[in-house]
UniProtKB/Swiss-Prot annotation:
Family: Belongs to the adenoviridae hexon-interlacing protein family.
Segments passing through the bilayer: none
GO BP field: symbiont entry into host cell
Organism: Canine adenovirus serotype 2 (strain Toronto A 26-61)
Subcellular locations according to the entry: Virion; Host nucleus
One of the record's GO cellular component terms: viral capsid, decoration
UniProt remark on domains: Three N-terminal domains of hexon-interlacing protein form triskelions between hexon capsomers.
GO MF annotations, alphabetized: hexon binding
Coiled coil: 72-99
Protein name per the record: Hexon-interlacing protein
Quaternary state and interactors: Homotrimer. Interacts with hexon protein; this interaction tethers the hexons together. Self-interacts with adjacent proteins. Interacts with kinesin light chain KLC1; this interaction leads to capsid disruption at the nuclear pore complex during virus entry into host cell.
Source species, domain of life: Viruses
Keyword Glycosyltransferase: no
Length: 103
């Protein structure tokens, strides 16, 4: 390796850090071939991009839990209605049994 190129990595891989004099910009938002934004590898705070993804996953799970809780509340209402129906049917059956026993 040439001593004047101290700190440079010579490799065939595109993922090598290219020196700034070559026009490379590290950790900045750019765009892909289709013009869509490409986020930086490192956020301003120095945290990796995985941190917001975890937060997003957590938020999605919270939304899913809200939906599950709504469904559970609906099921509780349906179960209560069914219990009331069963109680009413049991009363009718008991009344019929008492009428049959009297006769």
């Amino acid at each position: 390796m040439d001593p004047q190129q101290k700190g440079l990595v010579n490799t065939c891989f595109v993922t090598t850090r290219i020196p700034s004099w070559a026009g490379a910009r590290q950790n900045v938002t750019g765009s892909d071939l289709e013009g869509k934004p490409v986020p930086s590898d490192v956020l301003e705070s120095g945290r990796p991009l995985a941190a917001p993804r975890i937060r997003t996953l957590y938020e999605e799970q919270q939304l899913n839990m809200l939906a599950v809780n709504v469904l559970l509340d609906e099921l509780k209402i349906q179960v209560a209605a069914m219990q009331n129906s069963v109680t009413a049917i049991q009363r009718e059956v008991n009344d019929l049994k008492q009428r049959i026993a009297r006769d």
